[in-house]
């Protein structure tokens, strides 16, 4: 993806006004978050759309802070997700929210942490800096009651949504 992305950026008329491009990898789709310092020229918008179609990625434009990122195409408005099948979890996230960059390492990390923690039904456990619910929901799946603590209100909302979507809302609080 790096080489095609480099080629794309090299032909964009607005390239000097694009300070960064972030990559977010999901199980069903990948996304590029393009930081834009000024509105893109129509030919650049078309080049980005063509790139998205050719490479099967979603393009988000971010004119300000992370909360301003929005999909270029309406069809891309659904959230990205990753799965933790060993815990029967599907975790939704937006491309600007923190997730572990390597899904295999994330799965291993959660498995090992839970093996060491060995949560039991009825236990009460706190997950500090819970983010989108990566560890919180895996712990809750064990039968423990979990308090997820997070400094970002947007991530708290996301974690609560993930708890609900995974049928764990009664076992967690944020």
Predicted regions and their residues:
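Extended interfacial segments that mediate partner engagement and assembly in macromolecular machines
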Residues: 1-18, 22, 29
């Amino acid at each position: 993806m790096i080489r095609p992305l480099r080629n794309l950026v090299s032909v964009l008329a607005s390239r000097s006004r694009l300070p960064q491009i972030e990559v977010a990898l999901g199980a069903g789709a990948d996304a590029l978050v393009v930081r834009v310092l000024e509105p893109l020229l129509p030919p650049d918008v078309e080049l980005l759309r063509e790139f998205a179609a050719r490479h099967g990625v979603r393009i988000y434009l971010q004119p300000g802070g992370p909360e301003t990122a929005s999909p270029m195409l309406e069809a891309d408005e659904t959230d990205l997700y990753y799965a933790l099948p060993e815990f029967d979890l599907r975790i939704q996230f937006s491309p600007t929210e923190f997730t572990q960059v390597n899904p295999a390492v994330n799965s291993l990390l959660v498995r090992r942490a839970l093996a060491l923690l060995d949560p039991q039904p009825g236990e009460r456990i706190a997950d500090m800096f819970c983010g989108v619910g990566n560890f919180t929901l895996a712990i809750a799946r064990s039968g423990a009651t979990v308090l997820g603590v997070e400094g970002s209100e947007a991530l708290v909302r996301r974690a609560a949504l993930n708890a609900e979507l995974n049928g764990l809302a009664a076992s967690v609080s944020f």
